[in-house]
């Protein structure tokens, strides 16, 4: 096991926020040398906003690139990214549009380890996260610090459950048990990759 290393899985489909997300992730990490990025970039040749050329010589980056019209979907992309995992201690799955608090890496590891000490053998930290303004000028700054839970809003006519986030008014310091997982934010032990692999056909 590669102790303290975080494997960060990001599937991106022509997302102009991919580069800002990577930059913000590294900038706000306390220990950026412990980050390992697995990225699936699904792109159009005319797009320049998500060009990863500057990261290709960085040993922390493992990049899969495919044309937009060859995309099979996010589950397939995440399945391919999981093949890049190499025994890092932690697995962190994100969408390609995020912002990070200062020292996010040490803080989330501390929270994760505190859950293990409380006899949660394989905790998974997951949530819908507050939205943000790409220019970092939020119209409602308070929402950036909201703690959200995920709940069932309704069953859709096609059958699937429509899951929706809601703010937790009592901003407790510890995570609360949850029934659902949000694919755009999953922090777990690295063994998650092998124990709960993505089905590429979903």
Predicted regions and their residues:
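Catalytic cores of eukaryotic secretory-pathway lumenal/extracellular enzymes that build
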Residues: 1-202
